[in-house]
């Protein structure tokens, strides 16, 4: 039988005192740890559970009671530093719409932290060998498929971590003999944790230091230097002036 996921998405983050904005979608168990890791952050939470606000959660959380799979999130584009949600796309009718939609609410330096159940895990394959499939209402993914989905949803950098559950003796050997590749213990990885960034790491620092308008001005100045615009303009003016003399 499938096991429940152990919440480990926060391993992608380092505690700090920055005034971040962090949105948690359904995975409310992260809220207490987030408050400890980021004491100055504004925490937001989205859930379809009407009783969620009565749960043991940190004070000051900004709530939205809605089903994110069917109702658009009511936030400003480019608002959040992080969006955190386990198994976000497992029940989505159109997962790319959800993933791309979430990316719009992230700052250019922001990241989407999520996870997915690996369809190549030995437990899924073993059930299929026995004539069963228990994920009729869920979407399971391979690592490559999930990464491609995120790249197609406007994320520029993908990092993953594994949550493993070992196979019974000799099962992996049987699967490999049958033709299943097992690169990086994929067949024993039940869940993948994913950090999807809106920007490449080498650009994220630059974007955090300068506004969009400032970066556009820098690009124009660099282009003028690169193509020696001032010199070319001066030579053109001299040529035009010479023709009229």
Where do the protein language model's features map onto the residues?
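A conserved beta-strand element that flanks and buttresses the S-adenosyl-L-methionine
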Residues: 84
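Conserved N-terminal segment of class I S-adenosyl-L-methionine
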Residues: 1-74, 78, 189-192, 202-245
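Compositionally biased, low-complexity repeat tracts
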Residues: 56, 106-107
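S-adenosyl-L-methionine-dependent methyltransferase catalytic module, highlighting the catalytic core
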Residues: 93-97, 101, 107-234
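Surface-exposed amphipathic alpha-helices with a cationic face
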Residues: 35, 103-104
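A short His-aromatic
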Residues: 87-91
């Amino acid at each position: 039988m499938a096991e429940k996921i152990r919440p480990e998405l926060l391993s992608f983050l380092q505690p700090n005192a920055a005034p971040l904005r962090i949105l948690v979608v359904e995975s409310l168990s992260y809220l207490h740890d987030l408050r400890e890791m980021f004491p100055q952050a504004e925490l937001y939470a989205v859930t379809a559970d009407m009783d969620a606000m009565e749960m043991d959660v940190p004070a000051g959380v900004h709530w939205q009671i809605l089903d994110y799979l069917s109702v658009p999130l009511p936030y400003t584009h480019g608002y959040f530093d992080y969006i955190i949600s386990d198994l976000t796309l497992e029940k989505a009718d159109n997962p790319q719409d959800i993933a791309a939609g979430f990316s719009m609410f992230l700052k250019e330096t922001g990241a989407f932290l999520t996870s997915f159940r690996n369809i190549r895990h030995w437990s899924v394959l073993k059930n299929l060998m026995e004539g069963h499939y228990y994920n009729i209402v869920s979407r399971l993914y391979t690592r490559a498929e999930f990464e491609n989905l995120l790249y197609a949803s406007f994320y520029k950098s993908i990092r993953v971590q594994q949550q493993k559950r070992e196979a019974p003796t000799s099962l992996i050997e049987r699967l490999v003999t049958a033709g299943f590749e097992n690169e990086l213990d994929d067949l024993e990885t039940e869940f993948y944790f994913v950090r999807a960034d809106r920007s490449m790491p080498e650009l994220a620092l630059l974007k955090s230091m300068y506004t969009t308008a400032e970066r556009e001005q820098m690009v124009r100045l660099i282009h003028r230097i690169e193509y020696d615009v001032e010199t070319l303009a001066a030579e053109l003016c001299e040529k035009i002036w010479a023709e009229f003399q």
